[in-house]
Amino acid sequence: MTDQKPIRARSWLFTPATRPERFAKAAAAGADVAILDLEDAVAAKDKAQARTAALGYLADNPSDGALHALRINGLDTRAGISDLEALLGSSAVPDFLVLPKTETIGHLQILDRLLTSAGKGTRLIGLIESAHGLAAAEAIATARK
C-alpha cells in the first residue's frame, strides 16, 4: 500500500449525504475533516441520490478549506459496490475514504489498488466494527494508506 505522510485530524464532522445544503456548512464549521456519509445516515431508498450529491460536491469543491472524507457502504453490500463504482468513475477525489466493517487488511489493499489505478490519491480509513475486525486490528491500523 502507498506510504503517505500522516495528517493530524482531531475532529471529524459527519454530514448525511442526503443533505447537500449542509456540505459547505460542514466544511466551514471548523472541524478538521468533513465526512459525507453514504452509510448509516442514508436510508436505502435514498442511497443513489446521496451518492450523486456527495460525488458531485467533492468533484466541484476539491479545496474549499477543509479535508473531506467519504464514508461508503460496506463492500459486502450492493450499495457499497455501487458507491465504489461511482467514485472510481467520477472526478471526485476525497481526501479520505472511510470503509465501514473492515475485517482484514485485504479489504484496504483492494481499495488501495483500485483507487491508485484510477489516479486517486485518497487515503483509507478502515472502521473496525466486529470481533473479526478486532482480531485483525493491528494489521488494519498499520496499513500505510
Language-model features: where?
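Conserved alpha/beta-domain cores
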Residues: 3-145
